[in-house]
Design a protein with these regions (language model features):
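Hydrophobic mid-bilayer segments of alpha-helices in multi-pass membrane transport proteins
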Residues: 3-14, 21-41, 61-67, 251-262, ...
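Long, contiguous bundles of hydrophobic transmembrane helices that form the permeation core
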Residues: 4, 176, 180-297, 450-453
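Membrane-core helix-loop-helix motifs of multi-pass transport proteins
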Residues: 128-217, 385, 395, 408-445, ...
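Hydrophobic alpha-helical transmembrane segments of multi-pass integral membrane proteins
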Residues: 65-66, 93-125, 338-377, 381-382, ...
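Core transmembrane alpha-helical segments of multi-pass membrane transporters/permeases
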Residues: 26, 49-81, 107, 273-274, ...
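Transmembrane alpha-helix interface/packing and boundary motifs in multi-pass membrane proteins
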Residues: 14-21, 71, 105-114, 145-151, ...
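Membrane-interfacial loop-to-helix junctions in multi-pass transporters
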Residues: 1-4, 55-61, 87-101, 132-140, ...
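Re-entrant/interfacial helical elements at transmembrane boundaries that shape
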Residues: 82-85, 117-129, 157-167, 330-331, ...
Length: 453
């Protein structure tokens, strides 16, 4: 009975999310409560399960809250402006350098963990160069989304937070060993960017370089391009407001603070939530000492904070009921009778490979909260640690961002003036290649076993 209810809960959750009948936030709260009642769980017992799940995920929620606020303050203060400007100056009129610079810029901006911010800043900064050089904007969307897919594996990014939340593991234990894999993934994106840039240079030919764009050579839809260009230009008031937030005199201080934060994270100086709380407090007081300024900066980023943190606490209800009711144990026992014994020791590698199609066809919420906990219970019986399964589940993220279920990808293609289908066809093979590169690196560094035992 528990097995049927457990699978029914997961399938109902995934179906409603995929059909967009309800928001993930509502689904994570309402669906497990409904199925818990059907299982005969209620009253104080149900409340204790939910509270235990929320209590378990509270540190992750706190960490995400202050990480988003911290990096929001750093972007507001202009910490990354010199690097952005240096990239734009150095690429010149060489398509190979332009595409390479696009990848570097996207990887840098992706540190804040928000895809929409990455796409807006990257496209707004570098799209005019693509227009002037008549370059194919598909190169821009390809390397931008791949860089974002790799860099979004930070603890304050969505996928890792979901994996750690679903499996009740420490985000730092998942992330720190992933750093070399992320470095290799970014290196792969940079190599790809240079290859695409050289190919674009050959396509254009030397004669085309530095020539102002003609209407005939403008993007596929010149009307759309005109709208996009206009959309990329902020209003004067907005530009002045953004400039007033910059703190160029504190740039070195902010850089040192960020480096210290990352070092503290890697060496485990303090728990992640505490590190980000302390770093945020120092950053906002140093950059915006006046109380009205501090309130304004917090309010400016409150939308992102609420959207992410509310989802984490709602996931606490889901995982608390799934675990506390015994559903996940019953489901894993059932799967043990189905999964061939020879497969069980390789479930981490299988999960890493399967994360590419799974997260393409279903949302991250459905995969991490619905599928991963069940598979992890089976893997645990084969001697694979949940932390290893969490790392394995992240490998497919560059492919996930090409899914039509990812709203921010529509923003990217819209800003760049390309068709979504063209972007998918152009990028998919490269995304799979980056995922496989990260898989090989993860196995080489021992992040999860090729075969346990």
């Amino acid at each position: 009975m528990l097995t049927l209810l457990g699978f029914g809960m997961v399938i109902t959750f995934m179906t409603l999310i995929m059909l967009k009948r309800v928001s993930p936030l509502v689904a994570l709260i309402a669906i497990p409560i409904l199925f818990a009642v059907l299982a005969g769980v209620g009253g104080d017992e149900l409340g204790k399960m939910m509270l235990e799940g929320i209590r378990t995920l509270a540190p992750t929620g706190v960490m995400l809250m202050f990480a988003i606020l911290y990096f929001g303050i750093m972007i507001d203060a202009g910490l990354f402006d010199p690097v952005v400007n240096r990239i734009l100056r150095s690429v010149g009129n060489d398509p190979a350098k332009v595409v390479f610079g696009t990848a570097v810029l996207a990887a840098l901006v992706s540190l804040d963990g928000d895809g929409s911010t990455t796409y807006m800043i990257t496209v707004a900064s570098i799209l005019p160069l693509y227009r002037r050089l008549r370059m194919d904007a598909l190169n821009l969307t390809c390397v931008t989304i791949l860089a974002s897919g790799v860099m979004n594996l930070t603890p304050w990014g969505g996928p890792l937070a979901r994996a750690a939340t679903a499996l009740h593991v420490d985000p730092a234990e998942v992330f720190v060993p992933m750093i070399p894999v992320m470095v290799i993934g970014v290196a792969g994106v940079l190599v790809l960017a240079y290859v695409l840039g050289v190919r674009e240079r050959r396509r254009l030919g030397k004669a085309a370089l530095g020539v102002p764009p003609l209407a005939a050579d403008a993007p596929r839809d010149s009307h759309q391009a005109q709208e996009v260009d206009t959309a990329l230009l902020p209003a004067n008031g907005e530009s002045e407001a953004a400039a007033s937030l910059r703190r160029p005199r504190l740039r070195w201080f902010n850089a040192a603070l960020t480096v210290a934060l990352i070092v503290g994270l890697v060496v485990g100086l303090l728990p992640l939530p505490v590190l980000f709380m302390v770093a945020f407090a120092i950053a906002i007081v140093a950059n915006y000492p006046q109380l009205p300024e501090q309130r304004a900066r917090i309010a400016a980023h409150a939308g992102n904070v609420i959207a992410v943190v509310a989802l984490i606490f709602a996931a606490g209800v889901f995982t608390g009921i799934l675990t506390g009711s015994g559903m996940v144990k019953s489901m894993s026992d059932s799967l043990l009778t189905i999964v061939p014994p020879s497969w069980a020791p390789s479930l981490a590698t299988i999960t890493a490979i399967a994360s590419m199609p799974f997260t393409f066809f279903v949302s991250n919420d459905a995969f991490y909260y619905g599928v991963l906990p069940i598979v992890t219970e089976v893997a645990r019986n084969a001697g694979i640690d949940p932390v290893e399964m969490a790392r394995a589940s992240l490998i497919g993220q560059p492919v996930h961002l090409l899914s039509p279920l990812v709203a921010s990808t529509y923003l990217l293609v819209g800003l760049a003036g390309v068709e979504f289908g063209d972007h998918q066809r152009f990028t998919l093979a490269w995304a799979i290649g980056i995922c496989l590169l990260m898989l090989v690196a993860a196995l080489a560094f021992g992040l999860f076993p090729l075969s346990a035992g």
